[in-house]
UniProtKB/Swiss-Prot annotation:
The keyword 4Fe-4S does not apply. Its cofactor is Mg(2+). ATP binds at K9, F57, R85, T91, R102, N112. GO terms for cellular component: cytoplasm. Its EC number is 2.7.4.6. The gene is ndk. InterPro entries: NDK-like_dom, NDK-like_dom_sf, Nucleoside_diP_kinase, Nucleoside_diP_kinase_AS. This is Nucleoside diphosphate kinase. It is found in: Cytoplasm. Major role in the synthesis of nucleoside triphosphates other than ATP. The ATP gamma phosphate is transferred to the NDP beta phosphate via a ping-pong mechanism, using a phosphorylated active-site intermediate. The active site is at H115 (pros-phosphohistidine intermediate). It comes from Methanococcoides burtonii (strain DSM 6242 / NBRC 107633 / OCM 468 / ACE-M). It catalyses: a 2'-deoxyribonucleoside 5'-diphosphate + ATP = a 2'-deoxyribonucleoside 5'-triphosphate + ADP; a ribonucleoside 5'-diphosphate + ATP = a ribonucleoside 5'-triphosphate + ADP.
Length: 149
């Protein structure tokens, strides 16, 4: 079972979109193996987005993700990374298709509601940054036999 990291960013929390986003994830057959709401520290935000540290928007990105509570999740499922990227839609909401989280719920690139890991390596790194292994609960869903061959 593949794991990925997903975060509902502070704009999604403030706009009361957490339930909508969790519902979309679960309806797609993915499992929520861990979930936490907290305000990300500046150190954690800088580590999380370190690949963008030389970009001009880095400071505002760190300020934004530390500006209020966010919801961090570990999501499990077959092809979880690829599926979550598809559910989220394009990073820029203007380019995101209707039916995706960003296409339906986000309006601005800087406030695009949700983050998901883009590769197995980043998923492992991001999960490890935000969760201890003991906090992650793998479990069989009652509908697994109807979802997977």
């Amino acid at each position: 079972m593949e794991r990925t990291y997903v975060m509902v960013k502070p704009d999604g929390v403030q706009r009361c979109l957490v339930g909508e986003i969790v519902s979309r994830i679960e309806k797609k057959g993915l499992k929520i193996a861990a979930l936490r709401m907290n305000v990300m520290t500046e150190a954690a935000a800088k580590e999380h987005y370190k690949e963008h540290s030389e970009r001009p928007f880095f400071g505002s990105l760190v300020s934004f993700v530390t500006s209020g509570p966010s919801v961090s999740m570990v999501i499990e499922g077959n092809n979880a990374i690829k599926i979550m990227r598809a559910i989220n839609g394009a990073t820029n909401p203007v380019d995101a298709l209707p039916g995706t989280i960003r296409g339906d719920l986000a309006v601005d690139m800087g406030r695009n509601v949700v983050h998901a890991s883009d590769a197995p390596e980043s998923a492992e790194r991001e999960i490890g940054l935000h969760f201890e292994e003991s906090e992650i609960s793998g479990y069989p869903r009652a509908d697994d036999e109807w979802l997977y061959e």
